[in-house]
Amino acid sequence: MDLFEYQAKELFAAHGVPITPGEVAENPDQAADIARRLGGRVVVKAQVKTGGRGKAGGVKLADDADAAAAAAEAILGMEIRGHRVHRVLVTTAVDIAHEYYVAFLVDRSRRSFLAMGSAEGGVEIEQVAAENPQAIVRVPIDATEGVDATLAARIADDIGFPAAVRDEAVRILRGLWEAFQAEDASLVEVNPLVRTLDDRLIALDGKVTLDDNADFRHPDRARFADPSAADPLEAKAKAAGLHYVKLDGEVGVIGNGAGLVMSTLDVVAYAGETYGGIRPANFLDIGGGASAEVMAAGLTVVLADPAVRAVLVNVFGGITACDAVARGIVAAFENLIAAGERIDVPLVVRLDGNRAAEGRAILAAAQLPRVEQVETMDDAARRVAELAAAAR
């Protein structure tokens, strides 16, 4: 889960990392009220989960409340890299002497953690890496030892914090590491971490990615959920306990096990080349041991996508029994018909493995509209691509 800037700063403050005072506004009047309370110059910043806000006009300085309201009016509703702005952060402006970059992240190549930093903050780190890679400091972190005062001091020195703020930099680095560990994050980034004219260090912007697999340890994470920022189908699937990712094609794909589903995506895309570039519309893994209820929920999610022109259900029965999958398909159709929904999307079903014969018999007996059974994966992919192309 990626956090908005204001949410990231909330976590920073909880772990002792200094931030500027600020509040979130959803309309210009709220922005003006916040600016009055803060007093002085403020910055009005679009809250979207992407970079490039400044270049897109999503960050504006305001000298007073009226200017803050005008800035909020200009920013709210704009689209930045495909993300609509629904709220802004109004925060105190500061005079900057220097900008730094600091981050902790998962280093997948080493199967451990990594500290990164640079004295060239304030721009996207990818740009620094491309133009001046030697300006980026990388310090591996032993997962069993973490970041103590000695290592934090080494990182601060490598980045190049001056003596006047070195101790504060060490304290902030340890606070960010604490946030990284305590919150089960895969990324904690401050860009920029600024040194002010009076030698204070402040996190002016922040990015945090939380590991969704650790949600069970953090029941309070629900407060970070933002329905306006989530794909409604992905949110619906997550609520049903399904692993669903929306893609940009026309063929809905349902399978059991991530490996099989990914292979199915490849086979569908390959077959789709013959039919004008037909592609998968989603990844949906119903998991091992899926019940009829889970299958029904998955099919309901996929059929709710208006981009889907055909659906491929590809199941190799192991722990997941094929007859349970078949009952789920029947249940999904019954529920949709009972709700008055028209089922005009064809389904291609390939069942193999545990209780496949029983599953195929259940589907044959149900005589569901527009459901075809196919024996092999390749034939199923070709047929679903053909049907999707015909329905374009």
Swiss-Prot record:
Q: Which GO terms describe its biological process?
A: succinyl-CoA metabolic process; tricarboxylic acid cycle
Q: Which GO terms describe its molecular function?
A: ATP binding; magnesium ion binding; succinate-CoA ligase (ADP-forming) activity; succinate-CoA ligase (GDP-forming) activity
Q: What is the top EC class of this enzyme, as a single word?
A: ligase
GO CC aspect terms: cytosol; succinate-CoA ligase complex
- Bound cofactor: record note: Binds 1 Mg(2+) ion per subunit.
- Residue positions annotated to bind Mg(2+) are N191, D205
Instruction: Tell me the cofactors it needs.
Output: Mg(2+)
Keyword set, alphabetical order? ATP-binding, Ligase, Magnesium, Metal-binding, Nucleotide-binding, Tricarboxylic acid cycle
So where does ATP get bound?
A: K45, G52, R53, G54, V94, E99
TM spans (from-to)? none
Q: What binding partners and quaternary form does the record give?
A: Heterotetramer of two alpha and two beta subunits.
Q: Which family does it belong to?
A: Belongs to the succinate/malate CoA ligase beta subunit family.
Functional summary from the UniProt entry: Succinyl-CoA synthetase functions in the citric acid cycle (TCA), coupling the hydrolysis of succinyl-CoA to the synthesis of either ATP or GTP and thus represents the only step of substrate-level phosphorylation in the TCA. The beta subunit provides nucleotide specificity of the enzyme and binds the substrate succinate, while the binding sites for coenzyme A and phosphate are found in the alpha subunit.
Q: What is this protein called?
A: Succinate--CoA ligase [ADP-forming] subunit beta
The organism is Acidothermus cellulolyticus (strain ATCC 43068 / DSM 8971 / 11B)
